[in-house]
């Protein structure tokens, strides 16, 4: 009898342990679906609002959604011929559910977009207007659930404040869009070819510990202090069209390789006080004016495509040919302060550089031994003075 009771107790323990183990086992990971998209136009409001993505739009408006597989669309009907085109029902709500790696949403009419739920398979989100100008209605966006997102492009919308603070894995960020072609293959790989679209995004809040590597920006309303460009420690490439902000300093971006900016809004002078940028290979400022242009330790730097002038130039440990070419070919008509450190200039180089200056009452700062009689004479002829470093 005792033996039977002992066996029964042992069996109960085994069964209980097995049951606990099954209960504690993780749920199967979601997989990308390849089934064609389906719709439920009659879904109730509660079901739509419980979706992974919820859009608020005027009733009867059209939203374009890609991909054509892996999604269930609630509150809308699919077009009979264009399988990316959905017409929203009378309640003005559209829900998106499913497991896809890239989601693209196009509409001029979204007033609210919410993605508060975890979507671990979603790596890229593209939200763009159909029109090329920023005529889309002012939009509120909640992306707090996309903690695994790696690529985000938002363009063609008016957004007062865009909160990306939860997106700690984001590597590719596009605020506004224009066709970069072969200049930025990382963005083309992430988003495909997106036509030029104006945007009015006035503030961008980045994750404190962000890992953003590639950043494009084209927005007409973002001013200084509305995006922390000085906290981009992993940044490699930055492209900007028509900036409405002036500070291009990128204080923590010591990994920066390429910097491109063109046509500042309202003729704003840019402050390109870049500091130590040892990996920077290409700086291009076009159709722009710089209040200050300073960079150091960029030993492979190329400046040949920059046509921006500058008032103050400070170069430290960059190629002498690039420094000479920029100052004599672009900055010579506006510059009034030049500082040259750790650059292999000869006396003849300096005299030739000074002779090409077209401004007066400026200051040249170089090593004391370079302020030779010939250099000082050339400076005096231009109304400039020399100062020893």
Stretches found by the model and what they are:
Residues 14-17, 200, 211, 267:
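Generic short N-terminal amphipathic or hydrophobic helices
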Residues 20-131, 142-147, 166-168, 177-181, ...:
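N-terminal capping/linker segments that flank leucine-rich repeat
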Residues 105, 126-128, 153-155, 163, ...:
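Short beta-strand elements of solenoid repeat domains
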Residues 1-29:
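Bacterial Sec-dependent N-terminal signal peptides
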Residues 108-111, 131-140, 158-160, 179-187, ...:
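Canonical position 11/12 of the leucine-rich repeat
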Residues 93, 102, 112, 124, ...:
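Detector for repetitive beta-architecture
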Residues 14-15, 185, 296:
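Low-complexity intrinsically disordered segments
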Residues 174-191, 208-218, 225-232, 237-244:
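Solenoidal tandem-repeat scaffolds enriched in leucines and small polar residues
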């Amino acid at each position: 009898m005792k033996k039977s009771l002992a066996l029964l107790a042992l069996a109960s323990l085994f069964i209980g342990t097995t049951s606990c183990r099954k209960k504690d086992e993780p749920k199967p990971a979601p997989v990308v679906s390849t089934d064609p998209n389906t719709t439920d136009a009659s879904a109730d409001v509660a079901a739509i609002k419980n979706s992974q993505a919820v859009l608020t739009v005027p009733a009867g408006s059209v939203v374009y959604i890609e991909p054509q597989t892996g999604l269930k669309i609630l509150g809308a009907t699919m077009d009979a011929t264009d399988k990316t085109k959905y017409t929203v029902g009378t309640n003005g709500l559209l829900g998106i559910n499913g497991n896809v790696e890239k989601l693209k949403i196009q509409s001029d009419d979204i007033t609210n977009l919410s993605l508060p739920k975890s979507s671990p398979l979603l790596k890229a989100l593209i939200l763009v207007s159909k029109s090329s100008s920023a005529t889309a209605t002012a939009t509120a966006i909640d992306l707090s659930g996309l903690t695994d997102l790696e690529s985000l492009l938002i363009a063609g919308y008016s957004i007062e404040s865009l909160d990306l603070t939860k997106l700690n894995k984001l590597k590719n960020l596009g605020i506004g869009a224009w066709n970069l072609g072969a200049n930025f293959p990382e963005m083309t790989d992430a988003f495909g070819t997106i036509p030029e679209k104006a945007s009015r995004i006035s503030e961008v809040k980045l994750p404190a510990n962000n890992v953003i590597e590639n950043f494009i920006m084209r927005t007409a309303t973002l001013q200084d202090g509305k995006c922390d460009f000085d906290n981009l420690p992993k940044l490699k490439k930055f492209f900007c069209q028509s900036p409405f902000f002036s500070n291009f300093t990128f204080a923590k971006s010591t990994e920066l390789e390429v910097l491109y900016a063109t046509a500042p809004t309202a003729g704003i002078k840019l402050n390109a006080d870049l500091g130590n940028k040892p990996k920077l290979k290409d700086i291009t400022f076009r159709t722009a004016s710089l209040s200050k242009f300073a960079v150091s330790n960029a030993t492979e730097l190329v400046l040949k495509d920059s046509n921006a002038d500058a008032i103050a130039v400070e170069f430290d440990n960059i190629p002498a040919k690039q420094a000479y070419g920029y100052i004599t070919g672009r900055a010579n008509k506006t510059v009034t302060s030049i500082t040259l450190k750790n650059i292999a200039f000869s006396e003849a180089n300096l005299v030739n550089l000074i002779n090409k200056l077209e401004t007066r009452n400026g200051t040249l700062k170089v090593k004391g031994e370079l302020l030779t009689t010939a250099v000082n004479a050339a400076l005096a002829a231009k109304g400039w003075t020399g100062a020893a470093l």
